[in-house]
């Protein structure tokens, strides 16, 4: 086990504080509409240019291990805020720095850090309650566009595209972000259910120009089994051929004799048919097949239900108004499932989302939910260069997360104003002693810091701006984009309440942990060994040079 280096008390907090400041100072230059970019060197390829706080924070690793501890803890604030609310990472970092900076001074002066922490916790609790009172629900598409615009660094195009996507697919719908082939940023909405499996053979194509298979009013057969023999499928195929309607087969796989027979019948015109693989894997595949069956009003041929493929009737097959299948995707439009069955399935998936502890599982369940109720919108981000593409994609994702947060918990005045407005509640808090009061006062000063930094980045004196905003009421605040003092809600400068709340909670939590840290331990750096002198053995013949001066 390698030797450890240990610092206590003032020395430990001083080292941690230096790391906190280095990370926070790099992140906070990005805050606000006039925030600056940060260039990040990459070991390969072009440097990344970004104005996204969490991207900057994640890149920072300090050489001093004690300073790095402080930086990593504040990085945790940014990451946790990004995970929970999708935005507000820079605000959270600034708040954490301000709370810790103020707290360290008081602890150094002899205050009790545990009592200070209790004061901080009481203050944050009061502010969060008041934020809920200040928040207003999002009323229309215009407000959603404004939130998206602010989160995308005042890019109205991105804001409008996100608002349009949310209007089309609804609150439950899935919006994904992909790279476009051209310069334009566009949005497509997929109607109905789409899953990422295409036709098993190009011979199933009905539109050779577009290389897609299109069918109107088809039957849909779902089975979780692999189909390799024709005899299992024959009874169903005969029934479908009699009524002269198209058939889509969704199975684990269709291969060998079964696939060859389907292709031959399709080419001869005896049967309009297409086969695709079932989406997902394992238990998730079973669940997704059941979703398709519910949506189309059919049943899944499965051992679990005792339903065998060879015994299936037309009544057990699903139907849809239309299906479109290309090489990679299948889209089922307007399935014929009963609305009460779909509602019951949606309710079941929502319950699973509530119970899920895995982020990955929750994300997959939400995708399934969206396919059943809302649909899927795809935002294609276009840019001239790869560097610009990455930066723009980050901004689109930020805007998307912010708008979702706004729909969830409502909106508050933006530009750091909401925290100034709720500060009045701190006067009602009754601390148990002077040290707790000191904790409340730390929060009172720290919540001014985001507005101060926004003003500073825009070229204004922070203290003057804070004082002017404090004198106003309700939505009155400082619009850094124009340099004007106005009603920010009317001007469209709004923040999701969830983002402000999460930033404050996470910042206070980590800053309190740092304040109550009395000892820091890290591995001792190994001393550098002096380079060995080269062997001089081969120079023995120089003895005859003694006459030289």
Swiss-Prot record:
GO terms for cellular component: cytoplasm. It comes from Desulfovibrio desulfuricans (strain ATCC 27774 / DSM 6949 / MB). Forms a cylinder of 14 subunits composed of two heptameric rings stacked back-to-back. Interacts with the co-chaperonin GroES. It catalyses: ATP + H2O + a folded polypeptide = ADP + phosphate + an unfolded polypeptide. Keywords: ATP-binding, Chaperone, Cytoplasm, Isomerase, Nucleotide-binding. SUPFAM superfamilies: GroEL apical domain-like, GroEL equatorial domain-like, GroEL-intermediate domain like. Together with its co-chaperonin GroES, plays an essential role in assisting protein folding. The GroEL-GroES system forms a nano-cage that allows encapsulation of the non-native substrate proteins and provides a physical environment optimized to promote and accelerate protein folding. One of its GO terms (biological process) is protein refolding. The gene is groEL. ATP binds at residues 30-33, 51, 87-91, 415, 479-481, 495. InterPro entries: Chaperonin_Cpn60_CS, Cpn60/GroEL, Cpn60/GroEL/TCP-1, GroEL-like_apical_dom_sf, GROEL-like_equatorial_sf, TCP-1-like_intermed_sf. It is an enzyme of class 5 (isomerase). This is Chaperonin GroEL. The lineage of its organism: Bacteria, Pseudomonadati, Thermodesulfobacteriota, Desulfovibrionia, Desulfovibrionales. Its main location: cytoplasm.
């Amino acid at each position: 086990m390698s030797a450890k280096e240990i610092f206590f008390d003032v020395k430990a907090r001083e080292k941690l504080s230096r790391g906190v400041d280095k990370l926070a100072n790099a992140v906070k230059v990005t805050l606000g509409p006039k925030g600056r970019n940060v260039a990040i060197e990459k070991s390969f390829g072009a440097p990344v240019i970004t104005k996204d706080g969490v991207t900057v924070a994640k890149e920072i690793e300090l050489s001093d291990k004690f300073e790095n501890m402080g930086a990593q803890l504040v990085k945790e604030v940014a990451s946790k805020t990004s995970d929970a609310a999708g935005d507000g990472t820079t605000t959270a970092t600034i708040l954490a720095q301000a709370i810790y900076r103020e707290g360290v001074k008081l602890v150094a002066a002899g205050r009790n850090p545990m009592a200070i922490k209790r004061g901080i916790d009481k203050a944050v609790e009061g502010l969060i309650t008041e934020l809920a009172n200040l928040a207003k629900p999002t009323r229309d598409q215009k407000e959603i566009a404004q939130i998206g615009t602010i989160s995308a660094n005042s890019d109205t195009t991105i804001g409008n595209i996100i608002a349009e996507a949310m209007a089309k697919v609804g609150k439950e719908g899935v919006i994904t972000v992909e790279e476009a082939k051209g310069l334009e940023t566009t949005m497509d909405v997929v109607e109905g259910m789409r899953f990422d499996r295409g036709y098993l053979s190009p011979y199933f194509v009905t539109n050779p120009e577009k290389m897609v298979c299109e069918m109107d009013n088809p039957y849909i057969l779902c089975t979780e089994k692999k189909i390799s023999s024709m005899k299992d499928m024959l009874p169903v195929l005969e029934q479908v051929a009699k009524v002269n309607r198209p058939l889509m087969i969704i199975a684990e796989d269709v291969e060998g004799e079964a696939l060859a027979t389907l292709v031959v019948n399709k080419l001869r015109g005896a049967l309009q048919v297409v086969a695709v693989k079932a989406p997902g894997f394992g238990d998730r595949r079973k669940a997704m097949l059941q979703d398709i069956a519910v949506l189309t009003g059919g049943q899944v041929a499965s051992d679990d239900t005792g339903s065998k493929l060879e015994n299936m009737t037309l009544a057990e097959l699903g139907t849809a108004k239309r299906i479109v299948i290309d090489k990679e995707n299948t889209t089922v439009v307007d399935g014929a499932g009963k609305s009460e069955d779909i509602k019951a399935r949606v309710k079941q998936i929502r319950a699973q989302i509530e119970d899920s502890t895995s982020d990955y599982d929750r994300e997959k369940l939400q995708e399934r939910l969206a396919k059943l109720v809302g649909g899927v919108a795809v935002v294609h981000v276009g840019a001239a260069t790869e560097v610009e593409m990455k930066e723009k994609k980050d901004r689109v994702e930020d805007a998307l997360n912010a708008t979702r947060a706004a729909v969830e918990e409502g909106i508050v005045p933006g530009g750091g104003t909401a925290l100034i407005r709720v500060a009045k509640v701190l006067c009602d808090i009754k601390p148990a002693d002077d040290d707790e009061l000191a904790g409340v006062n730390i929060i009172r000063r720290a919540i001014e810091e985001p507005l101060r930094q926004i003003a500073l980045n825009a070229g204004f004196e922070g203290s003057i701006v804070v004082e002017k905003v404090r004198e106003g009421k309700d939505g009155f605040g400082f619009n850094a984009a124009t340099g004007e003092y106005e009603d920010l809600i009317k001007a469209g400068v709004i923040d999701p309440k969830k983002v402000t709340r999460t930033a404050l909670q996470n910042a206070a939590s980590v800053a309190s942990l740092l304040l109550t840290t009395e000892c820091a331990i890290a591995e001792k750096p190994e001393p550098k060994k002096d380079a060995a002198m080269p062997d001089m053995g081969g120079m023995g013949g120089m003895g005859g040079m003694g006459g030289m001066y």
